[in-house]
Amino acid sequence: MRYLSVAEIAKKWDVSERSVRNYCAQGRVNGAFLTGKIWNIPENAEKPERINKRKEEPLTLLDILKEQKASKYSGGIYHKTQIDLTYNSNHIEGSRLTHDQTRYIFETNTIGVEKEVLNVDDVIETANHFRCIDMIIDHAKAALTEKFIKELHLVLKNGTSDSRKDWFAVGDYKKLPNEAGGMDTALPEEVADKMKALLTEYNAKEEKTFEDILDFHVKFERIHPFQNGNGRVGRLIMFKECLKYNIVPFIIEDNLKMFYYRGLKEWDNEKGYLTDTCLTAQDKYKAYLDYFRIGY
């Protein structure tokens, strides 16, 4: 085996000779030995890592969303998520704004239309939904609570025509019975207890799986705790929980709408309907991550 001097190794490793001698004296260079006062170092010896050098963990999607949100970075995954999630989640619920109009509101905080009538609530709820997405990014790691869920609803419906109705509780549970997709939901007097039980059951699980998140969503939608806005709040919760547990999130688009509704309805009999629908949506979001070179 060929041995090199301290000076030769220092040049090879691009460090000072003093650092090389310290590494050798600390026993951190395999095969190095002294001949008198001269260190003999194997030519294939590897440079020791600095003790205080912290191994960098790869950034998660949540880390990147937080960074891009804070820096107001345009054209990245945060920008795309805000527009696509808002447009699709509102569109499922009947919003008539186009994808381009949604993007324009996000990018400019204005909307320009010619020879077209827009529903004011569609515009307000779009702007509000952007704020809701910021909330789930900021609080992604926090435990899911009734308080947070109610805050999402409050922000989503703030300033809408619903908020001016006496019988509509903004940021609180429903006052009147309602149905979802032709199915009965929890009665107003049952909602608080059912929500507490659902959250207790869900939060008792230390690590949530993809199926756990979908199961919570189904049960949440069946309770239908709010007078209106349950679907959007429910999908925001799913996105938040995926971020928390480093699961690739997903956006239910219009072409998946009927499969999504079927999955909610048939969950007890066949979990595969909803699971496959959400996995299809997840594949599309993975394509976004691939494009932006974000690992998952």
Label each residue range with its predicted role:
Residues 2-13, 17-29, 34-296:
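FIC/Doc superfamily catalytic core
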